Each structure stands twice: as structure tokens, then as C-alpha cells.
Amino acid sequence: MQFDYIIIGAGSAGNVLATRLTEDPNTSVLLLEAGGPDYRFDFRTQMPAALAFPLQGKRYNWAYETEPEPFMNNRRMECGRGKGLGGSSLINGMCYIRGNALDLDNWAQEPGLENWSYLDCLPYYRKAETRDVGENDYHGGDGPVSVTTSKPGVNPLFEAMIEAGVQAGYPRTDDLNGYQQEGFGPMDRTVTPQGRRASTARGYLDQAKSRPNLTIRTHAMTDHIIFDGKRAVGVEWLEGDSTIPTRATANKEVLLCAGAIASPQILQRSGVGNAELLAEFDIPLVHELPGVGENLQDHLEMYLQYECKEPVSLYPALQWWNQPKIGAEWLFGGTGVGASNHFEAGGFIRSREEFAWPNIQYHFLPVAINYNGSNAVKEHGFQCHVGSMRSPSRGHVRIKSRDPHQHPAILFNYMSHEQDWQEFRDAIRITREIMHQPALDQYRGREISPGVECQTDEQLDEFVRNHAETAFHPCGTCKMGYDEMSVVDGEGRVHGLEGLRVVDASIMPQIITGNLNATTIMIGEKIADMIRGQEALSRSTAGYFVANGMPVRAKK
């Protein structure tokens, strides 16, 4: 089998590349996905409110676990990643958050990455998006990804939580992806007008999969990339339960889009990475790149939970006897409780003046429950998900064997810096202050978690060690740049090799301020133009907010 391009991973970025490259009918593409199809009849992935379900099984989730995390009481922590057409966009929380403009400007400070500034990237965010209220300088109107805005009156707790943030002295913003990210406001989500999850399988692949020049193989577990000298010339993979490899050759390029956990594993199994690690497993060295699998970053978050005195939370939706009606409303009308992820309000703040742009993110949820659907509080309640955005802690992903089915050693080194502890203590104390504003007085009951007895630095630290969880935002393991630990250049091309790029969240040099999916899609759009040799979209001239030393919050 011969193709112009072979794409490994039909996830958030891989599906973008498959769709854009096959717009040229003379370009042939093979898209390999280790998971299965995105079954449209399966409510677990298609109903926004069911977002916890895919994380509980292994049909759509790789369900990785970390090594014991040394600063988290040696807990082995979840590291869920999407498996199937759509990748993690098939199982994520559907929060459409791009990050802060200064994240990208910060990337562009690196020599060679100058064209990754916010204004260079904004046209690609817009290209990918169709926002339900129409386009403007910041948002697109005819892209493959459906973005739904929060509407007034959905739940009084959303408005009350935003108002409480403002009463605590923080800014109000009407668009967390617009002129000003900093502040509290409504959150956009990747949901279609029909109330379905807007994964990249739905948005991108639906328009491309009927093209004769696109071949899609599911249940195809990539074993390794084939090299001729320093040039990537093909891919070998295992189909289904077969132990006999299948191979295809790429006339132009192999495009690795397997995500921040799998992309470094595939490079390592293919002989690209740290020479000592590869020697341990008798893998012939193709090219030494010590940064492969290093620089692993993530967002940690905690839940601060409160009893709700008014019967306005989503608690009744958790009762089995209410679920048939909710399911029918969603299935036949695309409306009701099932049609939202219920992350419809949130915010970004600076916890201290020393941060030039927000370092703490909030998601508000009008029910008290863990993100993966466990430990639901058996009463009306609400909660804040809160966590730091740009932790200095760094970890790694390393293969444990040559077997592609064996999970790697994953270590995030969560909370390994004093800055982490300071940010989380600040986050808990600031959140309590916000939760005690007048806007929430009629709703706020007792604090369920951490509980009012948890007050000292030592008590707060112990709560974080035992209860902080991943936000499922791993990135950085094949970082873009030109220093000795970088893996790819500013166009995603792997250093020292030919015909091989990495295009996914692993190439982010530093994690962004917010959820990763929108930016991963943007990376796919931007590099698709580079691969095709097309001129980049014209730089945006939109303005954006920079705090420039402004006070963190207004004086009362």
C-alpha cells in the first residue's frame, strides 16, 4: 500500500490534517486509528451531559495510570486519553477555551517560533470554528467545529457564580476567548446546534470520509515508523488482535498525531529518542533526541463543593427515574439537560500580582460530583473546579517495552515546586472568598469539601495531596523549538530526520492557560497549510487585553 501521507492518530489534530490534505483530490492519505469508530448511536460519547461515562470504561479511553506520584502521597493517578475516531475530542469535557493570548506570544519569544504569536494563530482558531451567534474579529462563522455559547436563564447558579466573582473584585468578561480572557463569564462549548458533541470526527471527518483519496483504518495500533536512513518512509501497525504487522509506505511524509502520551512512545519504539532508554530495550537508534517524552505537563484541579439550599442544582438529573425523560428530550429534540456539558460559566484570574496573565482557572458546575462521575453528593449541591495553569513541574513518558500494547511509564511530578503549593493554597482561599459573596447567599449551604475545618497551610496541602485530580490536559512531550531538548521545529518537523512531523498537543512548548482541545485543533489547521506549502492566513489585527501590572482585583 502506498500513500502520499500516512497520519497516525485520528484525534483532534489528525482529523484536521486528514480533512485538509484530502481537499486536493490528487493527494492520497492513510489515516490510522488504534481505537474504533465514533458510534453515533452511543449516547456515552454523543450526549454532552454524559461526558463522565467514556472515562469509566475502556472502549473509548486508554485509561493510562501514572507511576506513583511522589508529591501526591504516592498516588497512581488517572491519565485518560481518547481512543477512537475523534481521539480525546470524543471523550473530553467539550469546553471550548483557547488559552490566553500571552501563552502564544510567550511561545513566539522562542527563536524560530516567531510566527506562533497570538495574532498569527487567531486566524486559524477562526478558520476551525462555527460559533452559534455568528462571526466577529475573534470567532469564525463557517468552520468545521460547532461552538455553542451559554444562554441566559439556563440555571440561576451560573449567573450567581459569575456575579460572586465580580463582587469579590475580579473582572467580568463576556467572552473568555475574545478580547479579554481575564475575569468571570460564560463558557463556550463544542456542541452542535442539535445538542450533539462536536468532536473532530463529526466536524472534520464527516466531510472527508467519503473522499476516494482518504483511507481510514480503525483498530490499527501503530507499532513503529519505518525509516530508510534518516527518512521516514512508512508505518507498520497491528490490526485488531492480529500479531502479524501490516505496513504501508508514505511517498511524502509520515504525520504523527497520536497525542502527548502516545506520540513519544511511537517515536521511542521507532528508534528516535534518548539513546540510553532505547538501548535498554535493544531498539536500534535511528536518531538521538533526548527531549522525546520529556517536558510532560498537565493541569491539576480540585473540587470545592457546597450544599445548595435551593432546589436548583442538577441533582435530580442523577436520579434514574428522571433519566428516560432527559434522554428522550435529547435524542428527539437535541434539547434539555442532556444537550449541555453544564460547564457554562467559569473564569481566569491572577492569584498574585507577580503573574503577568491569569494563572488560575475556574469551571463552575451546578451539581456536586467528581468529573469522572464518581462520588456524587446525595443532595442538591454545586462546585468549583479550580487549579493552576502553568505549573513549573515537569514529567516524562517512557516506554516500558517494545510491545505497542504495553502502557508506558508516565510521571507528571505533580506539585514538585513550591510555586505549585502556593498557587493551590491561594486558589482554595480565594475560592472560599468568592463563594461567600452576597450573590450566592440564597444558595450556599455548608462547605462539603474540603470542609471548614481545613484551614492551615498544612491542612490545605494535605487536601491537595489526597484529592487534587488531573484535568486531562497532558502536553509538551515532543516540544517545538530549537534548544537541545526540543523535538520538532516551528513547522512540526522532527529535528535531524526527513519526512516526519509531529502535529498534536505534544508539540506545545509550554502548557496554555485553559483547556487544550481548541488549541490542538488550531495547531492542526496551521501546520496543514505548512505541509501543503500554502501561504499562511493573514495575521489578525484584533486587539487583546494585557494587564500590564494592573491590580489583580478592584478595591472594595
Swiss-Prot record:
Enzyme Commission number(s) of this protein: 1.1.99.1, 1.2.1.8
Family annotation (PROSITE patterns): GMC_OXRED_1 (PS00623), GMC_OXRED_2 (PS00624)
InterPro entries assigned to the protein according to its UniProt record, in alphabetical order: BetA, FAD/NAD-bd_sf, GMC_OxRdtase, GMC_OxRdtase_N, GMC_OxRtase_C
Pathway assigned in UniProt: Amine and polyamine biosynthesis; betaine biosynthesis via choline pathway; betaine aldehyde from choline (cytochrome c reductase route): step 1/1
Pfam families cross-referenced by the UniProt entry: GMC_oxred_C, GMC_oxred_N
Biological processes, Gene Ontology terms: glycine betaine biosynthetic process from choline
Enzyme class: oxidoreductase
Active site feature: 473
Catalysed reactions listed for this entry: choline + A = betaine aldehyde + AH2; betaine aldehyde + NAD(+) + H2O = glycine betaine + NADH + 2 H(+)
GO CC term, one of those recorded: membrane
Binding site for FAD: 4-33
SUPFAM superfamilies attached to this UniProt entry: FAD-linked reductases, C-terminal domain (SSF54373), FAD/NAD(P)-binding domain (SSF51905)
Keyword presence, Translocase: no
Molecular function terms from GO: betaine-aldehyde dehydrogenase (NAD+) activity; choline dehydrogenase activity; flavin adenine dinucleotide binding
Keywords (A to Z) from UniProt: FAD, Flavoprotein, NAD, Oxidoreductase
PANTHER family the UniProt entry points to: CHOLINE DEHYDROGENASE, MITOCHONDRIAL, GLUCOSE-METHANOL-CHOLINE GMC OXIDOREDUCTASE
Family: Belongs to the GMC oxidoreductase family.
Function text: Involved in the biosynthesis of the osmoprotectant glycine betaine. Catalyzes the oxidation of choline to betaine aldehyde and betaine aldehyde to glycine betaine at the same rate.
Protein known as: Oxygen-dependent choline dehydrogenase
Source organism of this protein record: Shigella flexneri serotype 5b (strain 8401)
Phylogenetic lineage: Bacteria, Pseudomonadati, Pseudomonadota, Gammaproteobacteria, Enterobacterales
Gene: betA
